[in-house]
Amino acid sequence: MPSFDIVSEFDKHEASNAVDQANREIQTRFDFRGVTASFTLEGETVTLEAEVDFQLKQMLDVLRNKLIARGIDARCMDIKEPVTSGVRAHQEVVLKQGLEQPECKDIVKRLKEAKLKVQAQIQGDKVRVTGKKRDELQQAIALLKSDAGPELALQYTNFRD
């Protein structure tokens, strides 16, 4: 039976490249001349540091653009509130990887409500979808792409016939 997996992942190496490119861009931008600002990537957390709050917003836009250019969906970013202390401001951005249990249940529920002839199973941090025909699986993908919402960055992997 044909099947595929629904996951929410990103390439960590591409994320590292995006952070490096963002650092290079803010070092050469005119509006960041003479300003101490940087991005640091530790695990799945990117820390933005600048002198004032509005620079963090500009840096966040730069980071978002670089992630998109490197093929990482911007919806995987969990943006924390900026923290200002004295002459420094910093903000953390967590790059989310893997589907949580409520998100998996929501995907399974949407597939069942659509009355497609597919079965969905939760397997850890991914959802396996099986069906008798490849066309049914393509309908399931189209359904999830149309109403996945702005909060989920979904990828479809491990196609089997």
UniProtKB/Swiss-Prot annotation:
Which UniProt keywords are listed? Answer: Nucleotide-binding
GO CC terms on record? cytosol
What HAMAP family is this protein classified in? YajQ
Write out the GO MF terms.
Answer: nucleotide binding
Q: Family assignment?
A: Belongs to the YajQ family.
Q: Which SUPFAM superfamilies match?
A: YajQ-like
Q: Which organism is it from?
A: Chromohalobacter salexigens (strain ATCC BAA-138 / DSM 3043 / CIP 106854 / NCIMB 13768 / 1H11)
Q: What does this protein do?
A: Nucleotide-binding protein.
> Does the keyword S-adenosyl-L-methionine belong to this entry?
no
Question: PANTHER family from the entry?
Answer: UPF0234 PROTEIN YAJQ
InterPro entries per UniProt: DUF520 (IPR007551), UPF0234-like_C (IPR035571), UPF0234_N (IPR035570), YajQ-like_sf (IPR036183)
The name this protein carries in UniProt is Nucleotide-binding protein Csal_2524
Q: Does the keyword Acyltransferase apply?
A: no
Name the CDD domains for this protein: YajQ_like
